[in-house]
Each structure stands twice: as structure tokens, then as C-alpha cells.
Amino acid sequence: MAPKAEKKPASKAPAEKKPAAKKTASTDGAKKRTKARKETYSSYIYKVLKQTHPDTGISQKAMSIMNSFVNDIFERIASEASKLAAYNKKSTISAREIQTAVRLILPGELAKHAVSEGTRAVTKYSSASN
């Protein structure tokens, strides 16, 4: 019997969607390109900031740093979860792999809070979809 081909886990989280710039006809007949959309977590970061500190603002540079931080953490978690799925010979990343990855990546008390908030969010999502 021939040896099985080894499946490689995804090396990083899926890239952000960046649709190609579209050409639209302007009033004078010349072709004009629309700006390519860039997906960020800015609106969500802003909402959390207003929940915790309603009278505090955030600069564009600080928002950019926070967005990079969120992308970095998500990428680390996805990468670790992918490795865990590969170790267990699974082709799907489940909530269990994500939870274990969070426990491995985040330190001590931060991991405990992240796991409890994640569990709460999944429970809320599951009950809403039923």
C-alpha cells in the first residue's frame, strides 16, 4: 500500500479580503478607479473603548497600532490552532483548538478571562441561532 500524502496545516490565518479596484465611468467620460477597500477592526475597537471609557478618544496612529495588535493576536491563535489540529490529525479547527491555542499563547489570568469570554460569546451565538 502506498504511503499517504501528508496534509500541511495552513501556515497563517486567511488574508483579509481586498477587492480589486473597480473602474467606474465618471461624468466627463474618463475612467476613474475607486479606492480599494481595506478591512479593519477600527469600528469594533472604538465601540469597546466607548463601553469602557465613554469620555476618551483615540488617535489615528493609536487605532492603527490597536488594529495591528488584533491582527497579530488573531494570526498567532489561528497558527497555533492549525498546528494543534495537525497534531491530532484533524482537518478542521474547532472551538476546542481555538480554546487550547488561547491557553498556550496568552499568559495566566489573561488566558482565563479570554477563555471565559469566548465561551460566553459562543454560547450566546449558539442560543441566538436556534
Curated annotation (Swiss-Prot):
Task performed by this protein: Core component of nucleosome. Nucleosomes wrap and compact DNA into chromatin, limiting DNA accessibility to the cellular machineries which require DNA as a template. Histones thereby play a central role in transcription regulation, DNA repair, DNA replication and chromosomal stability. DNA accessibility is regulated via a complex set of post-translational modifications of histones, also called histone code, and nucleosome remodeling.
Example of a GO MF term: DNA binding
One GO cellular component term noted in the UniProt record for this chain: nucleus
Region span, Disordered: 1-38
Subunit structure comment from the entry: The nucleosome is a histone octamer containing two molecules each of H2A, H2B, H3 and H4 assembled in one H3-H4 heterotetramer and two H2A-H2B heterodimers. The octamer wraps approximately 147 bp of DNA.
Claim: Lyase is one of the keywords in the record: no
Modified residues (N6-acetyllysine): K7, K8, K12, K17
Alphabetical list of PANTHER family matching this protein: HISTONE H2B (PTHR23428)
Subcellular location(s) per record: Nucleus; Chromosome
SUPFAM superfamilies membership: Histone-fold (SSF47113)
Pfam families, A to Z: Histone
Chain positions of cross-link Glycyl lysine isopeptide (Lys-Gly) (interchain with G-Cter in ubiquitin): K124
Cross-link (Glycyl lysine isopeptide (Lys-Gly) (interchain with G-Cter in SUMO)): K7, K8, K17, K18
Phosphoserine found at: S11
Regions of compositional bias (Basic and acidic residues) in chain numbering: 1-19
Chief site of localization: nucleus
Protein name: Histone H2B.2
Keywords: Acetylation, Chromosome, DNA-binding, Isopeptide bond, Nucleosome core, Nucleus, Phosphoprotein, Ubl conjugation
